[in-house]
Every structure is written in C-alpha cells, then in structure tokens.
Amino acid sequence: MTFKQKIKSHYQNLLSEKINELRFMISDLAQDAQNDAKGSAGDKHETALSMMHLEQEKLNQKLAEIIAQKNVVDKIDADAIHTKVALGSLVQTNEMLFYISAALPKIQLENKTIIAVSPQSPLGSQLMGKSLGDEVEINKNRFQIKSIE
C-alpha cells in the first residue's frame, strides 16, 4: 500500500467512525424523544422535546456534511500520479504536506503530519493546477511545491 493509499484509507476510516457515531447519537435521541412523548405533558415537556428536535436537526446536518466529505474522499483515485495539483494530490511544500481532498483534521502517519485541505479552501484553491517548483502565498506564508504525487 502506497503512502497516499494509506492516507486515503485513514481518512475513510476516520469518517466512517464519525458517521456511525453520529447515526448512533441521532437514533438514541429519537428514541429518547419517543419515550418522552409517551408519558409526559406540559410546557416543560414540550420545551424538552423541542430541544431534542433541535439537537437532532444539528446532528443530521453534521451527518450530511461528513457523508459529503466521505464521498469526496471515496472518489479519489489514490493510484493516480499528478504532475499538477488536483483533487487527490499529495503535495509536499517547503513547510508542510497537504492532501487535496476535503477539509479534514490533520493526521500523523509514518512520522509525517498530513493536512487535508479542500480544493475550495483559500490554500487549496491557490494550489490547484500548480506544478513542481511553483509558489503560493497565504497569510504572508510562502509555500513552494517540492513534490506532487
């Protein structure tokens, strides 16, 4: 398994775990709301139910975001070799190692720190289409591309 394949696999596992965790929380909340609806009445009860529904909506929204991120990562061809920065590129700069995918938490793999950035982010959009040796500047930080996989 190549380093880029390991990165993709790590992010897929991370996102799958988060999806399962959110689904469990949503299911748990729905069950609590259903149980509360059976036996209580009154203003406090209605307020509690409303709060549960709001929390459930927030969790559903977060779940949709994470599923969308996982769909982006799933579509990446980890075997593709890039000469220009594109979705799925692993970009080594003079400062950091970037994985062009979705905005995800940074990870440590094989003693390297990988920062996942989306192509739509300020840094990602500047990196897209660049080649070996090109430079980009974000917030007065200059990044020179040392390698692209």
Q: Where are the regions that the model predicts?
A:
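Conserved hydrophobic positions within beta-strands
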Residues: E135, I145-I148
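N-terminal intrinsically disordered, low-complexity, charge/repeat-rich segments that act as generic
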Residues: M1-I76
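Alpha-helix boundary/capping detector
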Residues: A41, A48, M52-Q56, V85, ...
